[in-house]
Amino acid sequence: MRLIPSLAAIIIATPALADPKVIADLPPVHSLVAQVMEGVGTPTLLLDQGGSGHSLSLRPSQASAAQEADLIFWIGPAMSPALEKPFETLGENAHVIALMTAPGTLIIDTADSEPHTHDGEEGHDHEDHAEEGHDHDHDHEEHAEEGHDHDHDEHAEEGHDHDHDKHAEEGHDDDHAAHAEEAHDDQDHDHAEDGHDHHDHGPEDPHVWLSPENAKTWLALIAEELAEHDPDNAATYESNAKAAIANIDTLTAQIETTLAPFEGREYLATHRAFAYFEARFHLAPAQALTGIDGGAAGPRAMEEVREAAEDGITCLITEPETKEATVATLTEGTALEAHFLDPLGRDIAPGPQQYTQLLQNIAATYADCLK
């Protein structure tokens, strides 16, 4: 009889395992993580008060939360360079995953329009991926400093090989052998001369979340990482990831139907942020106007608008960062219709449905602009 209260005391004194503390950098990433964690917990969003993902930095309260986090999912330094140093100095409990360098991630070079994978693997079977996981080794004690050690021999989409050792600190080397998709092989866009860049993105376009294929790859990875830190809920993470992947497949088919009539139709953009979306849905690469970086439209941009008008182009895709006065100047006296799009979906409520709504909004805006 004496053992019973002793056992009860032991049970009472044993703390229950807390739900993993998870942080995501941008609203679309947060949405994907939230989908996988649904029914278990809620991730924390860093970009929670507007602003730009390119200039995202940690507030003191966020830095404290990051120190206590179990998992941090972010795009990587190509998108938010100010986060790299803080993430490198986090405590040993914080496991940082840069999604842009995750295996299987499709990458588009800023001087190109065709995606290639970020490794040399055979590709992902998204039906089985959440269950079977990635074919790569994790050293979780050193992941925040050294990243994943990936050894991938080949992949189905003929990308290029990456050495991912220490990618969180040192970046990665690319061997650009070939490109996966051929949706845009009829146009050559030299963005150093003909386009512009709101931000110095470097050699690779960081807007990787706008590829639904990348989202599916990441959902499986997110489930795997969560399961390793919280094995008691592994089945829930796996089931949620599979359901989210299936939903993206359904959404992708719907968007393909919506945008099929506009394949190859040309348009202008104040900033070429939607290359991944364009490539996946066979849209012509945007003709990015020169020198518009949130400021006034210069003579060259106006000349490009005039030439576009002569070619019968009537669609202009612009972003919230572009001033309304600039847009008015660009469209005045022309047949151009400006349509605003936010690649981050900051006008959409954060949560599990944000990513789906973001892609739906982009598709609807393109269809309306290109009609």
PLM ranges: what are they?
Residues 1-5:
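Positively charged n-region of N-terminal signal peptides that target proteins for export
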Residues 9-10:
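Terminal low-complexity/disordered tails
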Residues 13-17:
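N-terminal signal peptide c-region/cleavage motif recognized by signal peptidases
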Residues 19-371:
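Extracytoplasmic metal-acquisition and chelation regions
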